[in-house]
Structures are given as C-alpha cells and as structure tokens.
Amino acid sequence: MEWTPAMEHNSLSACCTLSNGAAIPCVGYGTWQMPDGSGTADAVLAAIRAGYRHIDTAAAYGNERSVGNAIRASGLPREELFITSKLANPDHGYEATRAAFLRTLDSLGTDYLDLYLIHWPNPIAFRDQWKQANAGTWRAMEEFYREGRIRAIGVSNFCQRHLEALLESAQIAPMVNQLSLSPGLTQDELCRYSREMGMLLEAYSPLGTGRVLNVPEMAAYAEKYGRSAAQICLRWSLQMGFLPLPKSADPTRMAQNIQIFDFSLSDEDVAAIAALDCGGVPRDPDTTTF
C-alpha cells in the first residue's frame, strides 16, 4: 500500500487494494487479549457502531464466537464488513487446516472470510518440519480461496526465510504479512521483501502495546498536531504504508483511533518517529514456545 494524503478522508470508505484486487479497509479493529464473552461482543459491536468495518480475530484468541455474535448484532449486511481470522499453531498441515478453517467459519457464523492468515510460521509442535507443515497448510488455504470461501490469504509473523520457503511450493503468493510494527519497530528489510513479493503489511500492536505512548517525543508530536499520541502513531502507520490494527474497549478511544484521515504528518516527522527508541523488539518466530 502506498499512502497519499489525497486518499479518501472518510474512515468508512478509505480502503487499500490487495494484490488480487480485493479492497481492505485501511484501519482494522484488533481483538488480541480480548476473552470470549459478552464483554468482547459488546466491544466489537461498539467498534462497528463507531465506524470500523474491518475486524481482526484469530482462533488462538479464543473469541471468534463473540466476534460473530457482535457481527450479527450489528445488523449490517455481511458484505459491508471485512473479517480476518488466523490459523492456530496446533492446526498446521493440510487436513488440520481444512478442519480448523471450517471451525472458524462456524464460530464466526459466516460462510466465508475476507482474509485468512497463518498466524505463526514455526510452531513448537512442528519445529522439525515447519516447511512441510506450512506447505500443506497453504495448499488447503489455496483451495478454499479458489472456492471463494476465503477472499484473500496471507501470513503473520513470517520472516523472509519463512516466506521464501513457502513460495517454493505456493501457487498463489500471500497477499498480506501481518507483523508487529510501531514507532521504532519498523522491520525495514522484512517489510521491503514482503512488498517486493506483493504483500500488504498489516501492523498489529501499532501502539507498541502502549509503551510508545509514554515516549516523551510522542507527547510533543501530539501537541504539535493537536491530536492524541495514539492518533499520531496510527497516522504514522498509515503514512509508512502499514495497515494498523488498534485495539481499545473504550468507546472514546475507539472513535479517536479512526479519526486519522483528516490530517497528515510531515515527511520529516514520519522519519523521526520511525527512528524513535521505544524499546520494541520483534519476537523471533523460530524460538516461540507455543
């Protein structure tokens, strides 16, 4: 995605285009660490009512059923929402992926997903055979994509070595790589390679799990532009060409987090924010313990 200030200022209509031509709303609502239950359903419903049309969940979050309840409660036609979920680590491999995807559809109460991602490339259960497991998983995802049950397919937390291995057997290239991206944590080389391979970059934890908001420089930028520190971070993410996935259960902050289409940061400030020392370090997917 290449961001330009001339893009639509209406947060409800601002979309990016994936490599297959599918439109994806430029800001999503993240649901990591939101447990299954009425609280999560209420938060997702509030986000939809605030204007979000892109909801990001995962089987590993354990909240797909609550997300589905919120989608139905919203009363919006399914086609007006962009729903993403992700394959859980124990379910890699062709047959397991097919079964897991169908469970996700059932939990969400939908007959298709807009985007389905491999959540992690190297789960501990497949450490000695991750390449083969990912190849089988991807074959299953390609089949669902061709059947129209997934509108776009991609990956999350994949480094270049994982992408290269996947592309050796893939017939359809990933359209998205969802990564931990925030001020001071830009993963430049990985982002460059992902873009060269045609992938849009989604940013999870775009506020650095909150630590970025406490950096003194962010307060200065917030004052300069008359915005909250979170809005500065999210606008920065857009101008970096990332698609941010902020999370908040607070209705006021939910609304603020999508009010980022009516101002721009200077090129100098974008570069300076990217270079901030915010203490962020990407997790190595080859050493995860799950």
Predicted regions and their residues:
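N-terminal binding-site loop/beta-alpha segment at the start of enzyme catalytic domains
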Residues: 2-81, 136, 140, 208, ...
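Acidic (Asp/Glu)-rich catalytic clusters
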Residues: 18-19, 68-78, 105-110, 167-170, ...
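Active-site mouth loops of central-metabolism enzymes
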Residues: 27-38, 87-94, 125-130
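Short, acidic/polar
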Residues: 35-47, 93-108, 161-164, 185-186
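Beta/alpha (TIM)-barrel catalytic core signal, keyed to glycine-rich beta->alpha loops juxtaposed to Asp/Glu
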Residues: 36, 122-290
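Residues at the N-termini of beta-strands
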Residues: 54, 112-115, 152, 176
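A short, structured active-site edge motif that brings together acidic residues
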Residues: 78-91, 115-121, 181
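CE4/NodB-like, metal-dependent polysaccharide N-deacetylase domain
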Residues: 97-118, 143-147
